[in-house]
Structure formats: structure tokens, C-alpha cells
Amino acid sequence: MGQRVIAPELQALYDKGAQVYSYSKLGTIHDCPYNAYLTYIEKREQCANVYSSLGTVVHDTLEGIIEGKNTEADIGPAIENGLDELDMLGIDFPKTRDGGNGIRDKWISNMRCMARDWVSPKGEYEVEKLLILKLRDDRYLQGYADLIRVLPDGRLQVLDIKTSSQFKDEDLLHYGRQLVAYTLALEQAGFKTAVPCWIMVKYCKITYETGFGKRAKPSEKVLDRCKVGYTLRSIVRSKMKAAGYDSEQIEIVT
């Protein structure tokens, strides 16, 4: 993403002397004051890392599909080009405890599966929308929502594209505040809203039945994309065994 031009709405607030807080800046100050000092006081140039660099590549390509600038066929080449650039710069993924490349291999496997199978969300969207939440007459919070989905009933839903790992339950409140703040900004502007969501591109949800006959009931699992095939195979093999198929038949089918 390039440097953003100051939006007229923000300039109007600056001109009247209002204090405008950036959500991302506040997050940096809260999470690591030393990082905030180096970034905003010392103005140090930040070092690139694999997650921010590749996350931006995926993020921009998926948004480009929604805007009509890209297609699903562009995802794979964009990821491969991003990996090649990092290799040339000598920037690598963290190593596992034994010094291996398991973290890199898993991330790449998930992203390649995503690139192969991705179906872009359909409907009406706004991309990288500036949202401003009024805290009081002289204080405001501003940020940019990845996507705002316009639902058929007219409500707006804030969506955030994530290439990171799933959040732990105890971290949901911390990371969810940003989406809540953006949703409040929409409501403050007079819009009706729906519950905000993350789009976690490394994962997908599969639905399947467990049990047989009257005992059958739907079950759901959220899995790494690269594990879906193995998981479904395991489920099918288990159900075939329970249904009386012998091991040779199961092996042939699965």
C-alpha cells in the first residue's frame, strides 16, 4: 500500500484543532511502547518481516479481486513473487525449535491451497474505507476498514482480511476492539450494522455428519486449508469402517 493522501474529512478535523487518533498507532503504543518510540518519535524505518510483507501481498490481491483489478488467477503468482523477493532480500520465516522450516512450509502450503481454491466473496463492497468515530467534540478515532459489505437488507458489515493464525479465545476481545470501533463509527454516521467478522484466509470450515440414521448430526471443524483433504479422508475412512467395509475396500476408495 502506498502513502495515503490526507482525506478531506480528516483535514477538516485537523483544521479545527481536534485531536485525531489513529487506531493502528494507538495499538502500537499499547502493545510495545519502545516500538512506538522508535516509529513515531525517532522516525526509524521499520524492518520488513515475512508476515507483514506477504500479508500485504495477499491482502492487496484479494481486495483487488473485489475491486475488479485482479482475478483469482493472480493470487498464486503474487504469493510466489512475494516469496522470491523475500528470498532475494534474505528475509526468512522463523525457524522451529529444532531449526527446521516447518513454519515456512506450513504457511506456504496453506497459502497455495488458498490460491488454488479461493472464491472471492460476492456482493456489494467498499474497500479501504475511512471511518471516523467521534469520542467527544475535540477527540476522534480514525482507521481504515479492509472491507465494508452492503447486505441485502441495507445493513453494513465490517470485514477484516487476516493471513495470520487464529486468535486464542483470551485474545478475541483485544483484537476485536478494532472491528467494534469501526462498527460504532458506522452506527454513529447513521447506518444500521451487522456483526463484524474476520476473513481468516489460512483456514476453512468444513461441515459433515457424524453418526448414522437417527443419530446422525451435523458437525463443523475449522481447519488449516492444507489439512482439509487429510481430515476428510480420515472421516470417510472412519465412517466406512463403521459401516462394515473391509480394509481393502476402504483403501481403494480413499
Label every PLM stretch briefly.
Residues 57, 61-130, 134-135:
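A non-catalytic, helix-rich entry segment at domain boundaries
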Residues 50, 54, 103, 107, ...:
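Hydrophobic (often cysteine-bearing) scaffold residues that line and stabilize catalytic clefts
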Residues 39-40, 60, 64, 113, ...:
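Residue-level signal for well-ordered alpha-helical scaffold segments within enzymatic catalytic domains
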Residues 4-18:
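Charged, compositionally biased N-terminal leader segments and the immediate start
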Residues 27-37, 70-91, 154, 247-253:
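Short, compositionally biased low-complexity segments
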Residues 17-31, 139-151:
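An acidic intrinsically disordered interaction segment
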Residues 23-70, 128:
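Nuclease catalytic cores
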Residues 125-254:
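Mg2+/Mn2+-dependent nuclease catalytic core
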